[in-house]
């Protein structure tokens, strides 16, 4: 068994959609980034790549590549899943946390889990997503951005 850790953060700005776990969440601001800036999916991708010693999201989907401009991070997650299988790994589980003062994430978590399950072609029971605040502290507490952390375990299937 191998374990990987992922982290991502993006700034909240006006005139952008807020996409987390492939779900569009109604909110007055969205996350700024080259792709759709889905911090949850980006953290999960990094944790999966890290568990397999395959680098990070920037290595496989660089923000200097126009092919990834505005792309749905769910597509990047699908590609990551294919890369893991090609490299001889299967996903045991994913546990992720979204850190945001607002909006409330609980109403959207099941749809996030479903999207991730479909993108990676794994059982939804292998995916856990939690949300927390920083009690008004730091950049997430001041509603300047949203961050996410993820830990994943994989096993060799070769």
Curated annotation (Swiss-Prot):
Cofactor: a divalent metal cation
An MF annotation (GO) of this entry: 2-C-methyl-D-erythritol 2,4-cyclodiphosphate synthase activity
Domain of life: Bacteria
A Gene Ontology BP annotation from the UniProt entry: isopentenyl diphosphate biosynthetic process, methylerythritol 4-phosphate pathway
Record: residues binding a divalent metal cation: 8, 10, 42
Cofactor note: Binds 1 divalent metal cation per subunit.
Pathway: Isoprenoid biosynthesis; isopentenyl diphosphate biosynthesis via DXP pathway; isopentenyl diphosphate from 1-deoxy-D-xylulose 5-phosphate: step 4/6
EC number: 4.6.1.12
Residues that coordinate or bind 4-CDP-2-C-methyl-D-erythritol 2-phosphate: 8-10, 34-35, 56-58, 61-65, 100-106, 132-135, 139
UniProt KW Glycoprotein keyword: no
Catalytic activity: 4-CDP-2-C-methyl-D-erythritol 2-phosphate = 2-C-methyl-D-erythritol 2,4-cyclic diphosphate + CMP
SUPFAM superfamilies recorded: IpsF-like
Entry-linked PROSITE patterns: ISPF
Residues of the site described as Transition state stabilizer: 34, 133
Key words, A-Z: Isoprene biosynthesis, Lyase, Metal-binding
Subunit structure: Homotrimer.
Function statement: Involved in the biosynthesis of isopentenyl diphosphate (IPP) and dimethylallyl diphosphate (DMAPP), two major building blocks of isoprenoid compounds. Catalyzes the conversion of 4-diphosphocytidyl-2-C-methyl-D-erythritol 2-phosphate (CDP-ME2P) to 2-C-methyl-D-erythritol 2,4-cyclodiphosphate (ME-CPP) with a corresponding release of cytidine 5-monophosphate (CMP).
Protein name, as recorded: 2-C-methyl-D-erythritol 2,4-cyclodiphosphate synthase
Organism placement in taxonomy: Bacteria, Bacillati, Bacillota, Clostridia, Eubacteriales
Underlying gene: ispF
